[in-house]
C-alpha cells in the first residue's frame, strides 16, 4: 500500500511533512535526537553512536535507510526491529492522515515521508532515551529535518550522489547537508575536502554552533583483518582525545574514521552533560557495533562478504578494503564477485572503480546481475562495461541464480 500511495511525488519542501506530524500530535517534540547526514558512512556512524550509548545503559532508537532485507530494519530499538504488526498498524494510521493532507492540497507524499513519520510515531510509543535519526537525501530539505533541537548534529563524508537534487559540486552538496545544523547545537564533520569544510564551518558560525572537525584526528592501524585495531589522537586546540588499542568489528580504514566521528559526537554530548558515559563504555560500544551489509563477513569457510556500496565513493572504500584483506585473510584465495547496480546511479564510474579494484587483487571472476527493481541496470549492459582481458565476466540477470553460480 505504501508503494501505491507514493507512486506520485509532491513538491519539494517540508510543509507537507510538518502538517502530517501536526495531525499525528507532533511525536518528534517528545523525543531526543542525534541527527546524522552525509553521503557515505551515515549508517555506520549511526550504529557506532547507538552502540556506545547502549553500552552506557541508554535505550536507543535508530532510524536508517535503506534496508537490506525488509522494511523492519529501518526501525530499530536496542537491536530489535519493529514487529510486522506494529509496522502495519502505525504505517496504516500514518497513511490515513497523509491522505487528508493530500486532500488539503499539500501534494503527494514520498515513501520516505511515510516511513519517517511512521518511525517518529513508533519511537514516541516506545519512548527510547535517545533516537539516532539518519537523513534520506541531503539535509536542509530532507524529511527528517523537521526536528528542532537535536543533542548533536553529525555530517559524515560528502561525495557525489543525488546530484540532480543536491547540486553538481561538493560545495552545493555540502550546503544541502549542512542544513541540519541547528542554532547552538555542535556539529561534527569528518569531510577532509577544504571546500566542504568551508561550507560547514560557515553555516556553523551563522548558527552559533560549535564546529568539531573530525578530519583532524590522526590514527595508526595495529591490526587489519576480521576486525580493526587502532590508536588515535584528536586535538583542535580546545578538545583533546587520545585512545590506544581501540577495536571495531566493522572492517575498513573508512570505518576507523566513522568510529572516530561517532566517538567525538558522543564526547560532545558527554562534555555538555547531556549523557553519562565513560571511556570503557565507549570502547565497549565501538567494539560491539554492527552494521548490516557494510563489508560484512557472513561466513568464513569459504569467506562470503556482502557490501551495499551504491555510489563511487562507497565502492572505492570497499575496493580499498578488499585490497588490504588480500594481504591477510584473503591471501591465496579465489575471489569471485557478484555485482549489480541501478541505472540511475553513476554506474560508469562505479564499473571503472570495480574493474580497477578487482584487477589489483587478481580477482578470478565477476558475475553481473540485476537488483530486483525497475531501476536495475541490465546485466548485459553491465557486462559490456566491465569486460576486461584480465577478468572473466558472466551476466546472469536473476540474483539468486548469480549467487548460486558464485
Regions found by a protein language model. Name each.
Residues 130-135, 141-154, 158-159, 172, ...:
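Nucleotide phosphate-binding/pyrophosphate-handling subdomain across enzymes
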Residues 14, 21-29, 55-148, 164-166, ...:
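ATP-dependent carboxylate-amine ligase catalytic core
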Residues 49-54, 123, 269, 386:
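Hydrophobic alpha-helical packing residues
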Residues 63, 190-191, 203-225, 248-253, ...:
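Beta-strand->loop->alpha-helix junctions that form or flank phosphate-binding loops
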Residues 1-40, 44-59, 69, 127, ...:
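N-terminal leader/targeting and accessory segments in enzymes
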Residues 66, 70-90, 164-180, 201-202, ...:
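Active-site-proximal loop->helix
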Residues 101-102, 126-134, 150-245, 259-280:
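Acidic, Mg2+-coordinating active-site environments of NTP-dependent enzymes
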Residues 193-203, 208, 212, 303-306, ...:
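C-terminal helical cap/extension that packs against the catalytic core
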Amino acid at each position: 500500500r505504501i508503494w501505491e500511495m507514493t507512486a506520485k511525488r509532491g513538491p519539494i519542501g517540508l510543509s507537507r511533512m510538518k502538517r502530517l506530524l501536526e495531525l499525528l500530535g507532533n511525536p518528534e517534540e517528545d523525543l531526543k535526537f542525534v541527527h546524522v547526514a552525509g553521503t557515505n558512512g551515515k549508517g555506520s556512524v549511526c550504529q557506532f553512536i547507538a552502540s556506545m550509548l547502549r553500552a552506557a545503559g541508554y535505550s536507543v532508537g535508530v532510524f536508517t535507510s535503506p534496508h537490506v532485507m525488509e522494511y523492519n530494519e529501518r526501525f530499530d530499538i536496542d537491536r530489535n526491529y519493529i514487529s510486522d504488526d506494529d509496522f502495519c498498524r502505525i504505517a496504516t494510521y500514518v497513511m490515513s492522515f497523509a491522505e487528508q493532507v493530500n486532500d488539503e492540497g499539500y501534494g503527494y507524499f514520498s515513501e520516505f515521508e511515510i516511513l519517517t513519520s511512521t518511525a517518529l510515531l513508533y519511537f514516541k510509543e516506545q519512548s527510547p532515551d535517545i533516537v539516532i535519526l539518519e537523513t534520506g537525501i541531503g539535509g536542509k530539505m530532507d524529511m527528517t529535518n523537521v526536528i528542532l533541537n537535536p543533542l548533536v548534529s553529525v555530517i559524515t563524508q560528502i561525495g557525489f550522489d543525488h546530484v540532480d537534487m543536491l547540486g553538481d559540486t561538493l560545495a552545493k552538496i555540502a550546503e544541502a547537508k549542512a542544513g541540519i545544523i541547528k542554532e547552538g547545537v555542535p556539529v561534527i564533520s569528518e569531510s577532509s575536502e577544504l571546500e566542504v569544510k568551508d561550507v560547514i564551518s560557515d553555516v556553523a558560525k551563522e548558527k552559533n554552533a560549535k564546529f568539531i572537525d573530525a578530519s583532524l584526528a590522526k590514527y595508526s592501524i595495529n591490526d587489519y583483518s576480521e576486525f580493526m585495531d587502532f590508536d588515535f589522537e584528536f586535538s583542535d586546540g580546545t578538545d583533546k582525545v587520545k585512545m590506544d588499542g581501540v577495536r571495531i568489528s566493522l572492517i575498513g580504514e573508512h570505518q576507523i574514521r566513522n568510529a572516530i566521528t561517532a566517538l567525538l559526537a558522543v564526547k560532545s554530548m558527554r562534555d555538555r552533560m547531556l549523557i553519562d558515559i565513560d571511556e570503557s563504555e565507549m570502547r565497549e560500544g565501538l567494539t560491539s557495533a554492527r552494521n548490516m551489509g557494510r563489508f560484512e563477513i557472513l561466513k568464513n569457510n569459504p569467506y562470503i562478504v556482502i557490501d551495499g556500496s551504491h555510489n563511487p565513493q562507497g565502492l572505492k572504500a570497499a575496493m580499498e578494503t578488499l585490497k588490504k584483506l588480500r594481504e591477510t585473510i584473503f591471501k591465496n584465495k579465489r575471489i569471485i564477485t557478484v555485482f549489480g547496480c541501478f541505472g540511475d546511479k553513476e554506474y560508469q564510474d562505479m564499473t571503472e572503480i570495480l574493474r580497477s579494484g578487482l584487477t589489483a587483487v587478481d580477482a578470478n571472476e565477476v558475475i553481473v546481475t540485476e537488483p530486483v527493481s525497475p531501476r536495475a541496470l541490465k546485466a548485459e549492459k553491465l557486462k559490456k562495461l566491465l569486460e576486461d582481458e584480465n577478468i572473466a565476466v558472466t551476466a546472469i540477470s536473476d540474483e539468486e541464480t548469480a549467487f548460486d553460480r558464485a
